[in-house]
């Protein structure tokens, strides 16, 4: 049985840890509100951009001069995975889940005979993937280590991806990140960036009238010029949206993890306090028995 001094030390240590986890929970909750608002504000803009591209892409996709971001290279040999994670831990399985999803996707692609390259945003994804896929990791992780990622950072990353596409370094680019569903639910998912997966235009966007006739629009400048401008912007927007979703998911996961840690610390303090009191009572009882036995011996 542990001594009273050791038990007091453990109780003090756990109480100190409980204060830290409680403070981290409150900080994560504060950051979550801001991150959630930013993620929700970005969704309508990103969705509207997709609708706009859908209205333009129908007439351009089959053109030999269509932008490469839209149609890709025409091959499916080399895949670039852009994996977004956090720089910090203490967020439950948040980073492990996205790292596992990226590893599963990479292994599946390689089993199909494809070459995989990985660009990570966030230290935790890089640390996780280095164990099994170190040779596939690209050296640049320019966004890792930043406390706050702005749209300019997403734009810089999209420009880096576009430059690699123009250099012929990959054929398909896929974004892997944690979708923010709710405070208690963040699920890893994939979004293909290149070739751009533009949704089918809705009838109103495509210019279809109520009698089935399709309206013809004239664009100034032409569709290809507009797409050449909009597609890089859309690439940056989709990356930024994923960064915001991942940030909101990270803070939610950390808040939940710290809440669980605080509760567990409270339970441990109760158990240790009970053990301490029982040990103290046992020591008092033993001392009383020794005193009584000594008195009887006299």
Swiss-Prot record:
For this protein, the record's Pfam families field holds: ATP-synt (PF00231)
InterPro entries given in the database record: ATP_synth_F1_ATPase_gsu, ATP_synth_F1_gsu, ATP_synth_F1_gsu_CS
Major site of localization recorded for this protein: membrane
| GO molecular function annotation | ATP binding; proton-transporting ATP synthase activity, rotational mechanism
Enumerate the subcellular locations listed in this protein's record, separating them with semicolons.
Answer: Cell inner membrane
Q: Which GO terms describe its cellular component?
A: plasma membrane; proton-transporting ATP synthase complex
Bilayer topology: Peripheral membrane protein
Which GO terms are recorded in the biological process aspect for this UniProt protein?
proton motive force-driven plasma membrane ATP synthesis
Q: Which UniProt keywords apply?
A: ATP synthesis, Cell inner membrane, Cell membrane, CF(1), Hydrogen ion transport, Ion transport, Membrane, Transport
- Which NCBIfam families does this one have? ATPsyn_F1gamma (TIGR01146), PRK05621.1-4 (NF004146)
Describe the task this protein carries out.
Answer: Produces ATP from ADP in the presence of a proton gradient across the membrane. The gamma chain is believed to be important in regulating ATPase activity and the flow of protons through the CF(0) complex.
Partners and quaternary state?
A: F-type ATPases have 2 components, CF(1) - the catalytic core - and CF(0) - the membrane proton channel. CF(1) has five subunits: alpha(3), beta(3), gamma(1), delta(1), epsilon(1). CF(0) has three main subunits: a, b and c.
- Give the family from UniProt: Belongs to the ATPase gamma chain family.
> What's the protein here called?
ATP synthase gamma chain
Lineage in the entry? Bacteria, Pseudomonadati, Pseudomonadota, Alphaproteobacteria, Acetobacterales
Q: Which gene encodes it?
A: atpG
């Amino acid at each position: 049985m542990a001594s009273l001094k050791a038990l007091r030390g453990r109780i003090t240590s756990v109480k100190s840890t409980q204060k830290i986890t409680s403070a981290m929970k409150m900080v994560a909750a504060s950051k979550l509100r801001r991150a959630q608002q930013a993620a929700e504000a970005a969704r309508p803009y990103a969705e509207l951009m997709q609708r706009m591209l859908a209205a333009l892409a129908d007439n351009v996709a089959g053109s030999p001069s269509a932008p490469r971001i839209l149609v890709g290279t025409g091959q499916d040999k080399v895949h670039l995975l852009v994996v977004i994670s956090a720089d910090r831990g203490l967020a439950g399985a948040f980073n492990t889940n996205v790292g596992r999803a990226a590893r599963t996707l990479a292994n599946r692609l390689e089993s199909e005979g494809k070459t995989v390259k990985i660009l990570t945003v966030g230290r935790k994804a890089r640390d996780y993937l280095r164990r099994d896929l170190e040779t596939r990791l690209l050296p640049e992780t320019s966004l890792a280590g930043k406390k706050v990622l702005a749209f300019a950072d997403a734009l810089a990353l999209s420009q880096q991806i576009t430059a690699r596409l123009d250099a012929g370094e990959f054929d398909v680019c896929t974004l892997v990140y944690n979708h923010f569903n709710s405070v208690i639910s963040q699920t890893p998912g994939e979004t293909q960036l290149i070739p751009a997966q533009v949704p089918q235009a809705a009838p109103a966007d495509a210019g279809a009238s109520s009698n089935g006739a399709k309206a013809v629009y004239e664009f100034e400048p032409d569709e290809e010029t507009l797409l050449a401008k909009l597609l890089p912007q859309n690439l940056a927007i989709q990356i930024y949206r994923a960064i915001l979703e991942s940030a909101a998911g990270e803070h939610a996961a950390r808040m939940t993890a710290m809440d669980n840690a605080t509760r567990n610390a409270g339970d441990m303090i109760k158990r240790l306090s009970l053990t301490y009191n029982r040990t103290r009572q046992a020591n008092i009882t033993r001392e009383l028995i020794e005193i009584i036995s000594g008195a009887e011996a006299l």
